[in-house]
């Protein structure tokens, strides 16, 4: 694989790279480094800890259908030369659909990496040229058949910032009307509404094991539910 110079890459570029399966240049993710120095140097440490590593080279070592794996050679703000490996991903939209009666719509599907069926919120990768809202609308329609009159982004987070570039956008979907689902050929999805108390109980007893779903539901119940 060819050596590359430091460059910046957009999330849409990542999607193109995944589609083409080509090696591309990229920049390493920001890194912060702790410094156990004396209290007198706290101010200088605060400034240094927010500096980004210098990227010496970047290689795509794997290009699959869903994500890329990059290996970057970097110099940390401390001067340490090291290797950083990360998964490049264009981001995902996660939908929390609330029916007119207040129930929350969850889906169940088989997640191959876990070797089990999981209950979770509607979610999917943001395709090239899509906004998080457009991706949310598409995923909701495909996986459940429901259409929503209103979407509102209420939370953004990185699920695994240690090595995964993916950013998740959680959107509240309201004003739902039913329709015909349009799942992918390899998807077998069951959609089912639950009351707020039922969803809370599913979290309490461990029936909900999907992190994005737990985060989204708890945030909604704590700050948004009326």
Predicted segments with their positions:
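Short, low-complexity, intrinsically disordered N-terminal modules
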Residues: 1-3, 17-19, 27-30, 46-47
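Intrinsic, low-complexity polybasic segments
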Residues: 7, 16, 28-40
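Conserved Nudix-box catalytic region and its N-terminal flanking loop in Nudix hydrolases
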Residues: 45-52, 84, 94-138, 155, ...
């Amino acid at each position: 694989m060819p050596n590359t110079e430091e460059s910046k890459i957009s999330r849409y570029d990542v999607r193109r790279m995944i589609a083409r399966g080509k090696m591309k240049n990229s920049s390493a993710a920001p890194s912060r480094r702790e410094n156990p120095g004396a209290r007198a140097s706290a101010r200088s440490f605060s400034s240094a800890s927010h500096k980004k590593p210098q990227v010496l080279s970047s290689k795509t070592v794997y290009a699959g259908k869903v994500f890329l794996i990059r290996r970057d050679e970097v110099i940390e703000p401390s001067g340490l030369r090291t290797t950083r490996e990360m998964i490049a991903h264009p981001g995902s939209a996660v939908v929390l659909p609330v029916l007119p009666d207040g129930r929350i719509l969850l889906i169940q599907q088989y997640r191959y990496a876990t070797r089990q069926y999981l209950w979770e919120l509607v979610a999917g990768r943001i395709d090239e040229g899509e906004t998080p809202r457009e991706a949310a609308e598409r995923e909701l329609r495909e996986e459940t058949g429901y259409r929503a009159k209103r979407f509102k982004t209420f939370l953004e987070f990185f699920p695994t910032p240690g090595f995964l570039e993916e950013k998740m956008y959680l959107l509240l979907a309201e004003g739902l009307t039913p329709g015909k689902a349009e799942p992918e050929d390899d998807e077998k999805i069951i959609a089912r509404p639950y009351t707020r108390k039922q969803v809370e109980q599913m979290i309490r007893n461990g029936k909900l094991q999907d992190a994005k779903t737990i985060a989204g539901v708890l945030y909604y119940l704590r700050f948004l539910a009326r």
